[in-house]
Regions:
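Glycine-rich, positively charged N-terminal anion/phosphate-binding segment
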Residues: 2-3, 16-88
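Extreme N-terminal starter segment of soluble prokaryotic enzymes
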Residues: 2-11
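General structural feature for long, well-ordered alpha-helical segments within catalytic domains
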Residues: 12, 24, 77, 81, ...
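Glycine-rich, proline-tolerant flexible connector loops at the mouths of alpha/beta enzymes
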Residues: 41, 45-47, 97-118
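Alpha-helix-loop-beta-strand connector modules within alpha/beta enzyme cores
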Residues: 58-67, 110-131
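Short beta-strand segments
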Residues: 69, 94-98
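Mid-sequence acidic-hydrophobic segments that form the walls
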Residues: 84-88, 96, 123-130
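Receiver (REC) domain switch/active-site residues of two-component response regulators
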Residues: 91
Length: 131
């Protein structure tokens, strides 16, 4: 997997907690088969502590292209998550550095990472190195 997807999409629908679930993505896919869609953000700890492989069920083959959005601030954990998520067949892995929600802020990810570019750089480096 590369950092930048080789494909060019005319429409990308940003991941939004509480909105871009499987039903919403299905509706958007009816509108456009070529839009880049994303899962809701999933925190790295949720992936690492979930043994049921729940996150490989967030999408279906007919939903593609779909990106998986990770939330976190620990480069090693995010790298491990990226390996797991990559095995599920998502078209892209996206690191959340824009979510302004209180949940993201309390976990030190999302928009609060704008003030920590060194951490973002380390996270992106680890993710791209190992996936």
């Amino acid at each position: 997997m590369t950092i930048m997807n080789k494909n060019s999409y005319n429409l990308c629908v940003a991941p939004m907690m509480g909105h871009t679930d499987a039903h919403f993505r299905y509706f958007l896919r009816l509108i456009s088969k070529h839009a880049m869609l994303y899962t809701e953000m999933v925190a790295s700890n949720s992936i690492l502590h979930n043994k049921s492989k729940k996150y490989d069920k967030l999408t279906h083959e007919q939903d593609n292209p779909v990106g998986f959005q990770l939330g976190g601030d620990d480069p090693k954990k995010l790298s491990e998550c990226a390996k797991i998520v990559e095995s599920y067949g998502y078209d892209e892995i996206n690191l959340n550095v824009g979510c302004p929600s209180k949940r993201a802020q309390s976990g030190n990810f999302g928009a609060c990472l704008f003030s920590q570019p060194d951490i973002v750089a380390k996270c992106v480096n680890e993710i791209s190195k190992n996936s």
